[in-house]
A protein has these predicted regions:
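P-loop NTPase motor core
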Residues: 1-41, 49, 79-192
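Phosphate-binding loop that captures ATP/GTP phosphates
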Residues: 49-75
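A conserved SF2-helicase RecA2
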Residues: 191-199
Length: 199
């Protein structure tokens, strides 16, 4: 499945929370393919999510927090940070590590797919991710909401950027994270599951 939202709404932070929660429950690694933000920012969010610390608190006792983080996650979160992640590299890394979960932040930017139109490229990417999930483990991707999702609390499948059907058709579940522009709600997020074939 995938999580989508407008830029700077909290997709990476949300996935960081999910990954750190799951990491302590498995003996197999969680592979996080990051082609969106600086890898160090993702790593800091993972530490903050796991330990419940602000940035100043995290950096006040770096060595102790590193130890606590590794104990809590069992060292199971492996971050692959590259602006150009190719499908062949992903397949090789998955076979090598046999992960319990794979995260693509952002799945739309995975390279190695060709088609005549962008929506067909995205369809192939999401179909490929679905096949990986069948063969190996659950896959979670992130992508953007289009401009119609700006200021919308409850995002639906129609707000997914660059595709009205191709991405949505391949997902077992879709979670939209909305954010209102109303005063006093800047820090509030609104979660809407617009597709769920798991139940």
């Amino acid at each position: 499945g995938f999580v989508f939202a407008r830029p700077e709404t909290g997709k990476t932070t949300f996935l960081s929370h999910i990954a750190t929660f799951m990491a302590g429950q498995t003996d197999r690694p969680i592979l996080w393919f990051n082609n969106e933000e600086q890898g160090e920012k993702v790593r800091v969010r993972s530490y903050q999510s796991t330990l419940g610390l602000t940035t100043p608190q995290l950096f006040k006792h770096v060595d102790d927090n590193e130890r606590r983080y590794l104990e809590a996650t069992k060292g199971n979160i492996l971050l692959y940070d590259d602006a150009s992640i190719y499908r062949g590299d992903v397949e090789t890394i998955i076979k090598e590590h046999q992960p319990s979960l794979v995260i693509f932040d952002q799945i739309d930017k995975i390279r190695g797919f060709d088609a005549d139109r962008p929506d067909l490229v995205f369809g192939r990417i999401y179909q490929w991710a679905r096949e990986l999930a069948k063969l190996h483990c659950p896959i979670i991707g992130t992508c953007q909401s289009d401009g119609t999702g700006e200021g919308v609390k409850w995002l639906t499948m129609s707000h997914v950027a660059e595709a009205k059907t191709s991405k949505q058709a391949e997902a077992d579940w879709i979670l939209g994270i909305g954010k209102s522009n109303e005063g006093g709600t800047e820090d509030v997020r609104f979660f809407n599951i617009s597709k769920n074939k798991l139940m």
